[in-house]
Amino acid sequence: MNIPFVVETVLHDGLLKYKFKNSKIRSITTKPGKSKGAIFAYRSKKSMIGGRGVVLTSEEAIHENQDTFTHWTPNVYRYGTYADENRSYTKGHSENNLRQINTFFIDFDIHTEKETISASDILTTAIDLGFMPTLIIKSDKGYQAYFVLETPVYVTSKSEFKSVKAAKIISQNIREYFGKSLPVDLTCNHFGIARIPRTDNVEFFDPNYRYSFKEWQDWSFKQTDNKGFTRSSLTVLSGTEGKKQVDEPWFNLLLHETKFSGEKGLVGRNSVMFTLSLAYFSSGYSIETCEYNMFEFNNRLDQPLEEKEVIKIVRSAYSENYQGANREYITILCKAWVSSDLTSKDLFVRQGWFKFKKKRSERQRVHLSEWKEDLMAYISEKSDVYKPYLATTKKEIREVLGIPERTLDKLLKVLKANQEIFFKIKPGRNGGIQLASVKSLLLSIIKLKKEERESYIKALTASFNLERTFIQETLNKLAERPKTDPQLDLFSYDTG
């Protein structure tokens, strides 16, 4: 493993290439580069906990100490210094000193035998996510996965570190996503200290798996939108609009209006922002998400409020003194600022509620999606990375799952059409079915070395009568996601 290249991939040119003084590899004719940022490194977990470390400002200094450090800060700070005369205790690794955000990382902590996972489990979950980790490191009690950005996000103090706040939301959503199925430490610092890549701990590395901040942000917004809001034993009807206040038509009408002012007293800018914030609160969004969106809303206004006023309004909405935005008051706001002709039908969508469905054992009919869960679990249990498919019979599947014959046939066709499984049926007395999940096949390919992939893909193509391009294109989708719009200005300014 080329560890210097791994380090360079993570750091995104955030440090100098060569040491400013006493460089052993910089030529005499090459001038020292202009000062950039700094990171912190530690030679053991004990030293890290005690704060005993070193400040590094060049990649050369990292490479000189290859395999002697155990921890580092993969995100770059504006400066680093020491808190004592002996230069033993580091100082400066605080969020308000961040210079650039290079990567998100997740700490998978295994505390019991039941929680035992492998790097393959992380990759499998990542395939579902649609964003692959750039790097997976083995630690004493588990793993750490790095999701390195395509380009770094530069932090600016001018906007009260909005980029850090936005990145925190993304980082938390990534951790919560993986935490649904794997043992994730949800409490560790988002941009703090992590395991450093070494020759003895890198389990997986692919520099092609890097995505833009905008892509992560778009995904994160959807994740936040999907976070549920429960009410006793009731749930919102699937597909019903208006299930949350942020889904109501009035919310978008107010959110995209820009000509508010304070001259109308009770129905001015402050009231509109407070009402929008209440909608975020009642819909189950975090205060960080609401604050970020209210900053964006405020920036669009012809007469924006001061940022400290925005923070004050959001915190008031999240004080738990209110349940949500008042319907009557919403109507007044929309008529005052959007259009006086608006009616309740234009602004609100009636909600529908129903009780939780019975347990499967108590029902006469089982939904196809539930049979899908059973079948996918069965495939996963009977196959692994090294043999990602299983040979069996439809009869055996029916007996194991208790699924009716016609339902199984329909399920197989649906899953194949949705490109979730591959299967091949061999007729006759000695026939059967060869079955594999697309996810398992992709994972087995990802784990192979590049020179082995070609022959392996050919073998899979022959086994399942597949077009080779489908597997290759699917891999490419993971590695080469479509380019998105340029990043927002607030992420591109440097305070250095």
From Swiss-Prot:
DNA-binding positions are 120-141
Q: Which Pfam families match?
A: PriCT_1
* Top-level taxon: Bacteria
InterPro entries under this entry? Answer: PriCT_1
GO molecular-function term, one example from the UniProt record:
DNA binding
The alphabetized UniProt keywords are: DNA replication, DNA-binding, Plasmid
GO terms in the biological process aspect are: DNA replication
What role is this protein assigned? Essential for replication.
Q: What name does UniProt use for this protein?
A: Protein RepR
Q: Which organism is it from?
A: Streptococcus agalactiae
Q: What is the lineage of its organism?
A: Bacteria, Bacillati, Bacillota, Bacilli, Lactobacillales
Gene behind this protein: repR
